[in-house]
């Protein structure tokens, strides 16, 4: 159900602000988006997995909080991230 290490490393490399950046809001949102997209396929097959859906909703909520934080701190970085990931807003 989780992403493998190579995919995570690629996502971090694509969204990092500097060389060893793994904790910036951009990286965290990109990782959460990849996990959410991965889980959507799971729920198409397993529609009655309510326990897993709770985890998915928690991830969506965490992503929303990080996006709100980024929007408060730097609107330009927020807009660039939304465009890059193809999220609605």
UniProtKB/Swiss-Prot annotation:
Statement: the UniProt record of this protein carries the keyword Ribonucleoprotein: yes
Q: Which organism is it from?
A: Aeromonas hydrophila subsp. hydrophila (strain ATCC 7966 / DSM 30187 / BCRC 13018 / CCUG 14551 / JCM 1027 / KCTC 2358 / NCIMB 9240 / NCTC 8049)
Outline the subunit composition: Part of the 30S ribosomal subunit. Forms a bridge to the 50S subunit in the 70S ribosome, contacting the 23S rRNA.
Gene3D superfamilies, per this entry? 6.10.250.3130, S15/NS1, RNA-binding (1.10.287.10)
What family is it from?
Belongs to the universal ribosomal protein uS15 family.
- What would be one Pfam family of this protein? Ribosomal_S15
Q: Which SMART domains match?
A: Ribosomal_S15 (SM01387)
Q: Which GO terms describe its biological process?
A: translation
Q: Which UniProt keywords apply?
A: Ribonucleoprotein, Ribosomal protein, RNA-binding, rRNA-binding
Looking up InterPro entries in the UniProt record yields: Ribosomal_uS15, Ribosomal_uS15_bac-type, uS15_NS1_RNA-bd_sf
Q: Which GO terms describe its molecular function?
A: rRNA binding; structural constituent of ribosome
Q: Can you name this protein?
A: Small ribosomal subunit protein uS15
């Amino acid at each position: 159900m989780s992403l493998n290490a190579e995919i995570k490393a690629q996502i971090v490399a694509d969204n990092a602000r500097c060389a060893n950046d793994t904790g910036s809001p951009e990286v965290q949102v990109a990782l959460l988006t990849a996990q959410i997209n991965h889980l959507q396929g799971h729920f198409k097959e397993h529609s009655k997995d309510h326990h897993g859906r709770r985890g998915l909703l928690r991830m969506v909520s965490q992503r929303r909080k990080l996006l709100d934080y980024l929007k408060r701190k730097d609107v330009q970085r927020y807009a660039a991230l939304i465009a890059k990931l193809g999220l609605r807003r």
